[in-house]
């Protein structure tokens, strides 16, 4: 297993240089990338490296030293890769429409082949109330993805995280806090479990095995779920376990065309509605 580490050097006059190094199992430095507080290029190059070198026999990790950073361009995730944010605070500073992290989109990906075995953990992703109306994290056609111990903050007229036609995705011990939106013009689920039709997804199942566990949803318009449906096409095996929903403007859980649902151990505090269910569009 190879590990990609990020370290920072702080100079007395306030200028910061971040070094992103590629290190093998023997702790030999293979590659080094440098940046200031704008970590976009360094992270992008690290992800390019994992894209070209990670595989099921060689799982790689990108580790960022603790700090506050800006991302000014969408970073595309790679398979067989973990990103350890290491308690860092990363802000969306995109001047145009764009996410902080997104699954690959450089070609057509049938089934669940866009992204597999990917982990993001241990840090904060701040939407920064960026007016580009983009999700902080967007995953499509992805499989075996885990988001753990990540705080999502301050989304503007979109979702903190959006899943579109994914399988085996888990959010564990995450926080979703802060949102500006308008339910008259935007659906506003903090975690949207969306759906793609056959044109996008070649007729394959929309969702399977999505787990939201030990998470906190606070000061958002809607918590988790979807508002879209296609007749006779279900999202299956959805689990929402031991979560806390607090100060929810509308609905904490929106389950439209969900099948084989497990919802238990959740707390609802100051929510307009705890849960909404609609089967097959009815």
What are these regions (language model features)?
Residues 25-63:
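Acidic Gly/Asp/Thr-rich repetitive segments characteristic of extracellular carbohydrate-active
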Residues 12-18:
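Boundary at the C-terminal end of the N-terminal hydrophobic targeting segment
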Residues 70-74, 92-98, 128-135, 156-163, ...:
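Short glycine/acidic-rich loop motifs that flank beta-strands on beta-rich extracellular proteins
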Residues 69, 104-110, 195-202, 227-230:
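Short, recurring structural edge motifs at helix starts
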Residues 43-54, 70-79, 109-112, 160, ...:
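Short, T/G/N/S-enriched strand-turn elements that build extracellular solenoid repeat scaffolds
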Residues 34, 56-97, 125, 129, ...:
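N-terminal extracellular ligand-recognition/capping segment immediately after the signal peptide
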Residues 2-10:
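Bacterial N-terminal signal peptides
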Residues 82-89, 113-127, 143-154, 167-180, ...:
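Right-handed parallel beta-helix
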